[in-house]
Amino acid sequence: MSNRALCREASHAGSWYTASGSQLSAQLDGWLSQAQTSKRPARAIIAPHAGYTYCGSCAAHAYKQVDPSVTRRVFILGPSHHVALSRCALSTVDIYRTPLYDLHIDQKVYGDLWKTGMFERMSLQTDEDEHSIEMHLPYTAKTMESHKDDLTIVPVLVGALSESKEQEFGKLFSKYLADPTNLFVISSDFCHWGQRFRYTYYDESQGEIYRSIENLDKMGMGIIEQLDPVQFSNYLKKYHNTICGRHPIGVLLNAATELQKNGVNMSFSFLNYAQSSQCRSWQDSSVSYAAGALVVH
């Protein structure tokens, strides 16, 4: 490797998760040991991207389904929190650093994606400011450590895509989703509830506010499990649930639909659901987390 390899630093290490490799490794092992293996080998997972103290244990339920003896390349699709983006963007670097070990971007796949003309480049500043992809790097490194020399990653920052763009990107990524050696990591939290998020939907028939939030999230999760992008869009239009990874999820659902049209049999199941706290009053706020996995039969 030349000294000119460009790196993205682990900019959220030391704040959103520990910067100590040994501590991080032990933490991730601890959470993974609490989760069951039930949907292996996963072809895609949905997992949260909050600080690990909030969602580390939830995310483990998705990562437990990853089979390092099968997976060789990990696509990480994360929503853009800081820059307005109407398409998807690729990184400008070669290496993503983690406190565990460096992850190498698959430049061959990046080249093929770039050639489509559907992507833009994100600046290093945007790359390092964004946490939605980075929060999946330590878990990716941990679950793949037994095969780390064969591993490449394909980070993709997903913008505020229209439904037709979600369909186009879904179609493009479907050929990669068809390959058993690829894993898709879809980065998303679920409901952001409270006045600070300007979202306070409440169905009183559910009882406490946190129960209403759970019911709303699980309605959306049920639609995702049906792998139905149109229904998912309709659900978001109706309830406006603040699912920050709605566009990466939309891309996955469209990719899955494309493969199902071609006779590929698959199923998606959620394995864990959690809330950062239980909202009982209008002063409260919470973020929901869900972990799930897609398997191809």
Swiss-Prot record:
Q: Which residues form the signal peptide?
A: none
Q: Give a Pfam family name.
A: Memo
Q: Where are the transmembrane segments?
A: none
Using the chain's own numbering, where are the disulfide bonds?
Answer: none
Output the InterPro entries linked to this UniProt entry.
MEMO1_fam
Instruction: Note the coiled coil stretches, chain numbering.
Output: none
Q: What does this protein do?
A: May control cell migration by relaying extracellular chemotactic signals to the microtubule cytoskeleton. Mediator of ERBB2 signaling.
Q: Which family does it belong to?
A: Belongs to the MEMO1 family.
Q: Self-association or partners: how does it assemble?
A: Interacts with ERBB2.
Looking up NCBIfam families in the UniProt record yields: AmmeMemoSam_B
This protein is called what? Answer: Protein MEMO1
Q: Source taxonomy lineage? A: Eukaryota, Metazoa, Chordata, Craniata, Vertebrata
